[in-house]
Structures are given as structure tokens and as C-alpha cells.
Amino acid sequence: MRVESGSAQERGILLESLSTLLEKTTASHEGRAPGNRELTDLLPPEVCSLLNPAAIYANNEISLRDVEVYGFDYDYTLAQYADALHPEIFSTARDILIEHYKYPEGIRKYDYNPSFAIRGLHYDIQKSLLMKIDAFHYVQLGTAYRGLQPVPDEEVIELYGGTQHIPLYQMSGFYGKGPSIKQFMDIFSLPEMALLSCVVDYFLGHSLEFDQAHLYKDVTDAIRDVHVKGLMYQWIEQDMEKYILRGDETFAVLSRLVAHGKQLFLITNSPFSFVDKGMRHMVGPDWRQLFDVVIVQADKPSFFTDRRKPFRKLDEKGSLQWDRITRLEKGKIYRQGNLFDFLRLTEWRGPRVLYFGDHLYSDLADLMLRHGWRTGAIIPELEREIRIINTEQYMHSLTWQQALTGLLERMQTYQDAESRQVLAAWMKERQELRCITKALFNAQFGSIFRTFHNPTYFSRRLVRFSDLYMASLSCLLNYRVDFTFYPRRTPLQHEAPLWMDQLCTGCMKTPFLGDMAHIR
């Protein structure tokens, strides 16, 4: 007997499938398994495998067999830094604000909170709002903060003219800097976001009037002073064991590539003396012999676009030489320059070059979009996020979330009072589950890769500007030098033969035309 869409019988089947799912998830949560079935029984088999935090993930197909030349950034690529660096940057910039910019002494009470912000957030300068935006320019509600306090969803929507959407002209441009909104993309921006939020919190808490643009610029300048004055370099040089991580793995990666006949180069914005000390610590005194070209103080990203800056050679003491550069020699150190001269002198072009960096805009965007290099993004946060994804709590929460989504979609067919009541309860529970899942990653902002269901703006850039991404350079040690990376085919919404949430609920109907007759 055929069941008509919207009938009481079909609704009964739907509610029965929910009851079964509730029993399974409750039993799993309580540590028991009805009929010897576990939480993972709710998931398709291919979803149950745990992810490897040391894996390399592909956005685009790439064979290392075709790569002849490997390039690297230095900070957070060759050299991974400990989180202990962030409190130093925060407290020093805070003190600079007080002592040099004459900010209130009361700001000194704030200490760095490593759990507050995540990378990839946007800051609306005129509204003093720190927020997470998805790939479609929508603010994720519940992730907007002014100072250290959350801003109600209603206020966020009102601030943007009755919508969560941020218009394109206001959004960050190609390098993450728009007219009024900036995106914080590098790892060094974590203490900057924390300090900015603390200063705004102090001014608001003490009812002090301030110009949002001036405050933003002062905080940014104070953070910049920490770098420009070389303070951060001094801290690292004084205690490399404390601040530099995985140095032996960096040496292993470089040595392995050279042993297989690959050519290597380094392009970094850091000064030579700092890079030299760090590389000696990680690799040894002969580190320069591993690289065919070394370029320091490159001034990325303008290095990739400005043709006017010539290369300058440094002598063994780090002093500038005056001779014209007609070739780039192995073992020598060069300063500034530009990519166009680099390409002309090396003839390293196109897909046979693979460059690694941590900053999607400054390191990778131009190389991929304008020059056709292959690119690899170093995302240290990936390791922690994958470990969270592998937890039973995450899988339980996400599975039940997806199940509710499928049930909500089907339950819309029924318009009686009882159905509407069930629908409202499910919507409330789904929202609660989304908040729980978000808090597993970060209580304020969630995952750097996802909003509730969409990719973040950060993820959109990651996919656009990188062929590969990984937690650290050492992940290369897990693969042969001729390995081919294949991205998994992710079905578009209209391509999926079965809806994942239907697989989870046991409602195996597919969205074929006959089953969606109520849609006109």
C-alpha cells in the first residue's frame, strides 16, 4: 500500500525512526548498547574511521613526482614556535600602549588569555566588533564580541541593517584588509586580537569615550613595535629550546628532499641574523648548503607584486653589498628583491615548484593565482581540531545534529498543532547541539574551519590558495617523495545519491521527484 506524502501513517514512521535513534544515542551516551549496537552504528562505515592529525590533506590533485623545487617561509613553517611566545607579545605590546601611547594604567591588569580568540576572525573597526564570518559573508550568530563581552544576535543584525550579511565592499580585500573590516590571518595575530579586545573592554567598562579607528591603530602599532624593534627575535634567540619546536623534524625534511635531488629555497620576511641562529639550532652550522637560494627581509606580499625592488647580497657579517645581482648563488644570502627577478634568474616556474607557508595571503595567494606554483599551507591548529573531531563526544553531537536536520526537513510537511510542537522542540535541541559542538573547539568562536554548517571565510581562502594543507612541515615525512595526493570528491548538494542526515536517521528516502511532490 502506497503511503501518501503528509499522511498520518508516514508521520508515524518518521516518529518511529526518531524513537529508534533516540534509543541508540541515549544508550551510547550511557555506555550501553541495545542489541550490541554502538553510536558508530548510526554512521555510514566510511565516516567511522578516525582522522590522522599527521596526515596531509589535498584541495587539489598534486603529484610530488612532478615537483623539482621546494620553497619555504621561515616563521611557523620551517620554525614552529611554542604558544609561550604569545603572552610575551601581548604583555609587551600592552606595556607599550601604556608607557608610549599613554593609555590608562588600568589596562595593565589584563593578562593574555590563550582560549579567547582563534585565527581567521574579522574585526569591524568602526563597530569594535570581533566576529567569525562564513564563506558566504554571513556573521555566525553567537560569535560577535565587543571587548570581552558577547554582542546579542539582535544587535548584530541591527548593526548591519537587519541582516547577518556583510557586503562585499566592506569585506577584507585580496590581502585581508578592507576599508573598515580586517581579517586576522596569521598566528601572530592571536595576541593582537586579545589585546584589542582587552583595551576595548577597559574603555567600555569605565565609560570612556574613544575613537574606534584610533584605538585600533594604536593597538596594531604597539604589536608592530614588538616585531619592528626586534623584541620577539631577542626572546627566541635567548631561549631557542623553549620557543622553537620540532627542529629535528625540520632537519629531517630538508635532508630527505636534498638526498632525493630536490632544489630548495627560502623566502622570509625575517632578518638574516635571526634566521641564521634559528637554522643553526635546528639544522646545524652548514644549513645554507641545503638551500640553492636564501632570501631574507623579502617584504612579502609586495615581494610578489612590486618589480622595483632589486636583490641585494649580504656578506658573511650581514652587511649589504653594492654589486649588481646577475645570478643567485647557492650558499649566499640575498635581501629584498622581487619575484619577477627571482623567476628570471632561477627559471623556476609553474607546477614544478611547491612553496610552503603559514599565511594564506602573504605567502600563498599570489603564487597560486598569478604564477601557477603549487602551494602548501601550514596550519598548526589542524592537529588539535582533528583530535577533537576524533572524540566520541564530537561524533555523538554531530550525528544527532545531522539526524535532527533531516527530521526537521521532513517534518515541515505536517501542519497540525502536534507536529508544529515537535518541530519547535527539535529546532531548539538542534540549536543547543550546535552550540555544544562549537564549544568543543573554542567557547567563544568555535572551529577555525567551520561555522555551524558552512565553511568559514578562513576555510574558503585555505581551499582557494593552497593545494595541500597540514599541521606541520614534518607531515611530509609520512609520504614518499613521489606520492600523489588525491582530493576526495565532495558531492554537491544536487549530486548526493543519499542525504547523510537520512542515513543517520534511518529514513532512507532520497529526494527524488516522486517523493517531493509537495514541492512546486
From Swiss-Prot:
Entry annotation: catalytic residues: D73, D75
Record localization: Cytoplasm
**What's one GO MF term for it?**
5'-nucleotidase activity
Entries under Gene3D superfamilies matching the protein: HAD superfamily/HAD-like (3.40.50.1000)
Please indicate which superkingdom the organism of origin belongs to.
Eukaryota
Keyword Cytoplasm found:
yes
* Gene Ontology CC entries for this record: cytoplasm; mitochondrion
Give UniProt keywords alphabetically.
Cytoplasm, Hydrolase, Magnesium, Metal-binding
The answer to whether keyword Metal-binding applies is yes
- InterPro entries tied to this protein: HAD-like_sf, HAD-SF_hydro_IG_5-nucl, HAD_sf, Pur_nucleotidase
Question: Could you tell me the EC number(s) of this protein?
Answer: 3.1.3.-
Q: Which GO terms describe its biological process?
A: negative regulation of catecholamine metabolic process; negative regulation of dopamine biosynthetic process; negative regulation of oxidoreductase activity; negative regulation of peptidyl-serine phosphorylation
Q: Where does Mg(2+) bind?
A: D73, D75, D358
Pfam annotation, one family: 5_nucleotid
**Quaternary arrangement and interactors, per the entry?**
Interacts with tyrosine 3-monooxygenase TH; the interaction results in reduced phosphorylation and decreased catalytic activity of TH.
Q: Explain the purpose of this protein.
A: Promotes dephosphorylation of tyrosine 3-monooxygenase TH which decreases TH catalytic activity and leads to reduced synthesis of catecholamines including dopamine, noradrenaline and adrenaline. The exact mechanism of activity is unknown but may act as a phosphatase or promote the activity of phosphatases or may inhibit phosphorylation by acting as a barrier to interfere with protein kinase access.
| Family to which this protein belongs | Belongs to the 5'(3')-deoxyribonucleotidase family.
Name of the protein in question? 5'-nucleotidase domain-containing protein 2
